[in-house]
Each structure stands twice: as C-alpha cells, then as structure tokens.
C-alpha cells in the first residue's frame, strides 16, 4: 500500500516548488491509497485485520537528492535539510488533513476512539515542529528537530507546511482521521527507475554513473540526468 511522488516533476525555476501541484498530488494519492486498503491482498489474516482496523497508508516521495542537485543545494547543508523538512511536512500534513476530510464523510478508522487522545497529541507535536518551535512539546522526553524557516531559500515552503498542519489538526479535532498513519519514505529502488528518478528514496546520489546488477544476470548502466 505504497506510493511515491517524483519531486523533480514539481520543480520550478529559482529553487521553487510547485506547491499547489504537490499538495494536489498528495491529496489525490491519499484518497487513492485509502481506496486501495479494501482492494489489497495481505499475506496473513492478522495483517489484513490490522490493516482494516487502522487503515495505514504509505505515501512518500523520491528523488530529493536529484531535486537538490538541480537547485545547486548541497545535500548535507542547513538549506538542504530545511527544504527536505518543509517538503516532508507539507506531504504529511496535507495527507492527514485529507484523511480527516475522508473521516468526515466515512468516519475515522475503527480503532480511532481508543487512540484519539494519543493521535491528536502526535499531530499537535508535528504541528509545533512545523511551526519551528524548539520546545513546548507534549509528553516527549527528546524534543524533535524543528523546521528552521530561515534556512529555506523562500518562505513559501515553510509557510505551506505550517498551514498544512494547522488544517490537519483543526479538521482532525472535529472529525478524527480515516487513517492511523499516512506517510512513509520508501527506498523506491525499483519503482524509482520506472519513475525516471535520478536518486531513489531520500538518499543522495553516490555516483554520476552506476551499474545495477539484475536478478536474472547481467548489468545495466544508470546515468544521472540532472547534471548536464
């Protein structure tokens, strides 16, 4: 029950991301993955039952390394981390907000009442991190690293992240959530190639030219297309 978005497809000039298109894609794929819960096949009855009880989804992205390369931003830099944090926050915030919208129509996941207090606490902590606060988190022994807005190349990304989590919390308090979990960053080692990604998952590229070993024997060459 996984889906990944190729971030380079949302890239614009001057280190800009097409936020409206990205948010629309996150909403669309959250709904698609929610529908797929009832269509999926599971390896055991226990896994199937938990999937129906919690309706967990796996929306993610790939090619963050390629995106940063195309923008000329070092992967291991404050700016790179702020961009990645903002994109991750937008994706997860929009996905939970969409989940709350679905819950308004179809009801929350069946185990939500047993977990509502803790889940809303998690959402509030996520919102606080997206807003850039270093402390004030609820029932955490180790505070998360917040989104540092000043390190982003523009205010658009962190502002969108903050708005996404504000909506996720506001709607979730009213309607609950259709899904206990909505996002995950998968390795995308295979589908990333089909999606024309230069880097898979969340990792940077380790070489401009690579050779992938095939299970049936042989190799094929992979060339990073971000760098001309």
Where are each of the predicted segments found?
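Long, C-terminal-biased catalytic regions of enzyme "large/alpha" subunits
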Residues: 1-228
């Amino acid at each position: 029950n996984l889906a990944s978005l190729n971030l380079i497809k949302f890239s614009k000039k001057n280190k800009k991301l097409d936020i409206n298109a990205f948010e629309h894609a996150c909403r669309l794929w959250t709904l698609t993955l929610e529908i797929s819960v009832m269509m999926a096949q599971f390896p055991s009855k226990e896994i199937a039952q938990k999937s129906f009880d919690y309706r967990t989804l796996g929306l993610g992205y790939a090619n963050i390394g390629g995106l940063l390369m195309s923008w000329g931003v070092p992967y291991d830099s404050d700016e790179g981390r702020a961009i990645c944090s903002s994109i991750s926050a937008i994706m997860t915030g929009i996905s939970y907000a969409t989940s709350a919208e679905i819950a308004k129509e179809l009801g929350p996941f069946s185990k939500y009442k047993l977990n509502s207090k803790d889940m809303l606490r998690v959402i509030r902590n996520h919102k606080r991190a997206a807003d850039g606060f270093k402390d004030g988190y609820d029932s955490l022994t180790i505070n998360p690293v917040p989104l540092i807005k000043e390190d982003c190349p523009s205010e658009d990304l962190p502002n969108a992240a903050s708005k996404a989590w504000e909506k996720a919390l506001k709607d979730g308090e009213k309607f609950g959530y259709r899904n206990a979990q909505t996002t995950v960053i998968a390795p995308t080692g295979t589908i990333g190639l089909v999606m024309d990604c230069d880097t898979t998952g969340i990792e940077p590229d380790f070489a401009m030219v690579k050779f992938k070993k095939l299970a049936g024997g042989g190799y094929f060459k992979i060339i990073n297309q971000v760098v001309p």
